[in-house]
Every structure is written in C-alpha cells, then in structure tokens.
C-alpha cells in the first residue's frame, strides 16, 4: 500500500511539473518553443540537404518501405471498394490534376492579355516540372529502381508517394537552381516557380477555376522575363530612365528638386570647408610641433593624409593650400578691400614720418654734439599715439577676418606663464613706451617740461620715473636691451618700472604695488588658438566644451571671452581710459591739458 501511494504521489508530482512547464511563460521558454517550431517548419529542406534525395528514394522504394508496410497488412482490406478516381474525397489533389489538365482545352478560345501573362508563369512551372521528371528518371536509371511501386501498397498510398516524391524533386531542383544562379550572379525562374507552387498548394480547385488571376506573380514574371538569363544589371540606367520620364511629365518638379539639391550641396560644402579649415590648422600645428605624426593627426582630425602632406609641403614655400569655395572668395575680396584702406593709411603715416625725419636731420647733429637725449613734446607724442592706434585698429580688423579664412602657418608656441606688474591693460602702456622711444630718436631738442605732461597722460599704474641726462655709455647699454626703451631699464620680475635716485616728483611705491602672481594654468595657452576657438564658438559651429577639447584652451577663459565679446556678461569690465581719435594733424597741446585734468593729480 505504501509503495502504491508513493507511486501515485510521484505521478501526481510529475503531472504537476508537466502542467507547470506547459504554463511557463518565461521569455527563455518562449524562445525555445519558437525555435522548435521553426525547425519543424523547415523539416523538408533539412531532410533533403542532410539525408539526401537519393537516400530518401531508396528508403521509399527500397526493401525498407516494404518491410515497414508489411506490418499493416491485416489493417486494410484486400479490395478497395470505396475508392474511385471520379469521386471527391480528402485526397483532392488527384482530382485537381485531372481537372487542371482539361482547363486549357476549355478556355483556349477565350484568351486575354492577363491570361497571356499567366501563361508565361505556367510555362516556367512546366519547365521546372519537366526538369523534375527528367531528374527522377535519371535517378531511377542510376539506382536501377522500378518506377512503379509494389502492388501490395494501396493505391492511395502509391499516389501520395508519387506526389510527395514529385514535390520533393521540384523543390530540390528549384533550390539548387537558385543557389547556382546566386553563384553565377544571374536571376532565374526559381523565385517565380516557388511562388507559383505555393499559390497552387494554397488555392483550392474552385479558386483556380473561378477566382481572379494573381497579378503579383505576373509582375515578378515580367521582371524576370525582361532580365532573362543574362548577367544581373547593377547600373543606374533604369533609375535614370525613370527620372527622365518623370522630368518630361513634370518639369517644374525637376527644377525645384534640382535647386534644392544644389542648395544642400552648397551648404554642405561651405560647412565642411569651414570645419576643415579650423581642424586643418590645428592638425598642421600639432604635426609641426611634433605632438602628433601624420597618421595620428589624420585619424584624430578625420583629414586624409594626402591633404595633410599637401598642406605641409605648401607651408615652407609660403603658400598655404586652402579649400576652394565661395565663402573663401567672399572673405578674400573683403580682406582685400580692407588691405587697400590700410595701405592708404600707412602711406599717410609714411609721408608724415618722412616730413618728421627731414625736420629732425638738423637736430640729430645737435644730439650728437650735446650727448643728451631729451623727451619730445606732448603734441608730437600724441600725433604718434594716434597713428599707432589707427594702424593697430586696421590690423585687428584684418586679423579678425583672416583667422577664420586662412590657415595659420606659424608653429605652435609653447605657452609660458606671464608675470607682469600691471593688469590686463599693460599692452597699451608698453605701446606708449615704444612710441616714446621711437619719437625720442627722431624728435628735435625741446623743452624739459614735456616730461611732466607725459607723466600726467600715462595711466597711474604705468607711470614711469626716469633719470636726468643720459650719456653715450648708458645709451649703448639701452640698445643692448631690445625689449626696453631708454625711458627706463629695470628688468626686475620682467616689469617696466624704472626708478632712480633722482626722481623729480617722488611717486610713492604703494601706488605702483604689484598684484600677486597668478597660479595654476592661468594664461598658459596660445593666443592665436584661443582666437580661433572664440571665432568657432561665436559663429555657432562648436560649443565651448567641444572647442576646449579640440583646441586645448581653458574652459572658463574661453567662456568668459565669448560672453565678453557677445555682451552677455553679468558684470562687464570697466571701460579703459582711451584718447580721442580726432585725426592726424589737429592734435594740439590743449588736448594734453584735457587728458591731464582727467587723470589723477600726482
């Protein structure tokens, strides 16, 4: 009893497990079930390719089939009284063949264009059926097998076996023909035959007799009959013919499409050239500095190596290669106009300098005799300052246009930490010193009160204390220092702060207090690369982060400069003290008085 109960419990557990497995809805089980279904659906093709068609025929017509059928001898009657060829039964394929053989003779008188197209498809199926019959006959002769089955096999089974073998042969030939055509690059009637066979298997007898024709098969047949058995045509002749026909039908649509394609192509060329200009200049700088070789630069920036080699060969010759596009022509013409204006101003400057040189020829002789260098008047200094400002403004204009359109040919400079005693307005002060140095060499011997006026004109942080008379030995020592003017020579910490014992106005050292040194990576970048990055960000071609990654400049500095130039800073910087640009020759001593009043008293 106990054993029986245990067996019943085990059977119940197995049934429960089977039910649970049947009700399992996990994706893994569902995927496995789908895989099994696919394998069952493709059993015929697997059977033919794995087992082989000849072995299947041997199994069907050989002694194995007779041995298997001998097991069912007692199950069926000896005489078949319930079968006749004219009766309808579940094996209607036999009757469909008999009826379909009569259909062409009945409908031969009534033929339409659609029937002609369908007849082409039927001719292809007839070809495949003939090939299958020939293949079967060849196999039977090769294997020495009788084409007729054993008389002990029932008639229904014989007919089914014949149908099955015939279907196998058709599928085998169509599939083998398809693989051969794929290897040869040609398209044959295998696809059409397969579709026709599927349609014949799915449609019933009434649908074949009364239903409409399947036009999809006819379309496929038309394409295949047009292509024929030749090589597959991969050219664009058909598409060009279609486009020509559509353009003949609708010329307005052709014009609109052509214009749209032309605009898109122009925009793409402009954008790609602009992007390529910026990246190309950066790549050339990296290659020249030795940071990257040509292969790595081409991979990193996406520029072909031939293009990089072409530009590198053009750089030493002084002719940087550039992309040809419409935007470049526009920028070149614009910069050419500005260069004309700059040349005109520079010619005026040259005439003025020549006149000054002629005036000061006599004063130079007096300078050599007295061995003294004295400062010019404030009016001549302001003339020179105005000219310098005008020239620098035109230079900035040209540079702002050229750094977008031209590729910089200079090598990448290693950024250095700049330590100076003045704030960001230091370049103006150094420019003033250079101007004073140039004017002092060519100006006449004038009154000593100009020194007081010049000190009042200069900004407070750039005030300079100078000594009295300068001898020939001190002049020689001045010329040894290329960066400093004879006004002052004190290279402590790289600052321009010349102090001497004989100070005339006794400025406090607290007024010229130096700011603290900047720490970290402050200003450790190339200014030309920074200008290029600012231009790319302001034009909307790159974001700040992308420009930082490509050009290698500080993120905060780049963001600040972009906001400063676009005028979106929350707290804009204070305006610098600028001298009015009133012209070349109408600056007088009265202007110095106004500047003096505007500055703080000494």
UniProtKB/Swiss-Prot annotation:
It is found in: Nucleus. There is a cross-link at residues 242, 319, 340, 397 (Glycyl lysine isopeptide (Lys-Gly) (interchain with G-Cter in SUMO2)). Residues 106-124, 585-602 have a biased composition (Polar residues). Keywords: Activator, DNA-binding, Isopeptide bond, Nucleus, Transcription, Transcription regulation, Ubl conjugation. GO terms for biological process: regulation of transcription by RNA polymerase II. Residues 544-564 bind DNA. Pfam families: HTH_psq. GO terms for molecular function: DNA binding; histone methyltransferase binding. May act as transcription activator that binds DNA elements with the sequence 5'-CCCTATCGATCGATCTCTACCT-3'. May play a role in spermatogenesis. This is Ligand-dependent nuclear receptor corepressor-like protein. It comes from Homo sapiens (Human). The gene is LCORL.
